[in-house]
Regions:
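ER/Golgi luminal nucleotide-sugar-dependent glycosyltransferases, focusing on the catalytic module
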Residues: 1-301
Length: 301
């Protein structure tokens, strides 16, 4: 297949750039000859010299300063979704707050719901809205939705290894659902992947019925349920888990603080994730083949 024009999307935040940006640019943007989009929240103190922001060809910015607890975003997203009713179906979505899993000691279920689940689904909705508004989907063949706090142990697989008819997810960190930290999509499966919030609004009774029977839902389980409802879960395929999330010594986080590494000088947010990435790096180093040959063997359908 000829070169597939690729857009990499950094979702929600551009944190940890001082540790990750050079690694990201080399192993993702340069490796894939890709363009960058940032779809993020900004406050008054946001640093517009952030290298993720300055490199981005497309910038979709949500004003968090005016909506620090994201309460306004619920009605904003609902009003900008074509729902054939005057009823506030988003209230069913907010009832999820008592069904989501949290590792924090915060007794405020709504706050835990925000940081574990809602913010991610909202920014997927915000991304989808802007991609349609500015007709970005028609300009690219492939779309990689990811995050800025990743360090890559290996270059990202070239798109020729990832058949566009499938949804490609790293092979790990599923937590009884499906990993939500990176997704490689194409035009035909972009919408059924990202329209989680829209589906909760349009199919509120069905989605709430799916989740009301148990507690401790997490984002990974919600994503899997959503893909099943959209009849695209059978399209999910896996590629090697080659990156891991970090946090700088004084960096902020909405969720997992991580374990500090004295050797590396930063927090490893999910130690098992780092171990998986290192495992794949070691497999490549022992293989004595090119990175393309390594992925051709490692990625099977």
């Amino acid at each position: 297949m000829n070169h597939q024009k690729t857009l990499v999307i950094i979702l929600s935040e551009t944190r940890c750039h001082e540790l990750t940006f050079d690694n990201f640019k080399k192993n993702v943007i340069d490796e894939l000859s890709a363009d960058l989009c940032v779809c993020i929240g900004v406050k008054n103190d946001y640093d517009y010299n952030n290298p993720y922001y300055t490199l981005a060809k497309h910038r979709f910015l949500y004003n968090e300063e005016d909506d620090k607890n994201f309460a306004k975003s619920v009605e904003y997203s609902y009003k900008n979704t074509e729902v054939a009713s005057d009823q506030k179906h988003y209230l069913y979505f907010l009832m999820l707050k008592d069904r989501v899993f949290t590792e924090t000691s915060n007794p405020d279920s709504f706050t835990n719901f925000l940081i574990s689940t809602y913010i991610h689904t909202f920014f997927l909705w915000f991304l989808h809205r802007n991609m349609k508004k500015f007709r970005i989907l028609e300009k690219y063949d492939r779309f990689i939705i990811s995050r800025s706090d990743y360090l890559y142990k290996l270059p990202f697989p070239k798109m020729k290894h990832l058949d566009p008819k499938y949804i490609w997810i790293p092979n790990g960190e599923d937590y009884f659902g499906i990993c939500d930290r990176t997704a490689v999509l194409s035009r035909q499966n972009f919408e059924p992947y990202v329209n989680i919030l829209e589906s909760f609004y349009k199919k509120s009774n069905k989605y709430y019925k799916n989740i009301e029977s148990k507690k401790n839902w997490n984002m990974e389980q919600i994503l899997k349920m959503h893909l099943e409802e959209n009849n695209v879960f059978p399209l999910v395929q896996r590629y090697p888990y080659i990156s891991y999330c970090i946090r700088s010594k004084n960096g902020t986080t909405r969720w997992e603080a991580g374990k500090f590494s004295e050797k590396l000088g930063y927090f490893i947010k999910y130690p098992k994730e780092e171990q998986q990435a290192t495992h794949h790096e070691n497999d490549f180093l022992k293989s004595c083949v090119s990175i393309d040959e390594f992925y051709a063997e490692a990625i099977k359908i």
